[in-house]
Amino acid sequence: GMSAISRKNNLGRNLLRMRKIFPKEFKFFPDTWILPTDMSDFKAQFNGKRNKTFIIKPDNGCQGRGIFLTRDFKEVPIDFSGGTLVAQRYMAKPFLLDGFKFDLRLYVLVTGCDPLRIFLHKEGLVRLATQPYVPPTQKNLEKQMMHLTNYAFNSKNPDFEENVNPEDASDGHKRSLTAVLDFLKDEGHDVKQLMEEIEDMIVKTLIAVQPSLSHVYHSCQPDDMSNSMAFEILGF
């Protein structure tokens, strides 16, 4: 069921499949390779003189464990006994918040899969890296607290700042979505359009896995016509 979206390799395959059919609508994620299946094509990306940076992730990892950046194909593991890997082109020029990389954690409630019924919580989290960002070079690829935003290990940085004021969620290395959107709006950014584009990506991601969800659901509940006997909360 939800392993179609919760496992990185399955999610990658589903999104890549949709990109082949609808290239314009599914261009919102970086170039992706599932290893070892796409190993030959991925290896070819290292040809040429340009120093391309890639990020490698275990398909079943969490909290940033096992993630690394590389510019050298020789650093890519060849033993896949522990599971497949997902490789993506690293975005070297991200939008920064106070000079730090950040990501969003949004919460989505799925209450039906045939048809899809989706709700997005209006509040979310913004997680910041704990080292100021500079573009990747061969010398800084191992600086995980600069390149990655995972809370699990950034919280171990002595420079990590907790937000201790419940009345103000605009400081620290973990902030509220509302506070950051207000900041971006004050800076002149169109946050309404931003959220519409984020909602669009969430819907398209779930559309990509809807056939699988529907099949599993009806296999378990063949007589249910209400489309309401199961739910799932997803973190995007």
Where in the sequence are the language-model features?
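Conserved N-proximal alpha/beta basic substrate-recognition cap immediately N-terminal to
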Residues: 1-53, 60-62, 72-78
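Catalytic core of tubulin tyrosine ligase-like
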Residues: 41, 45, 49-236
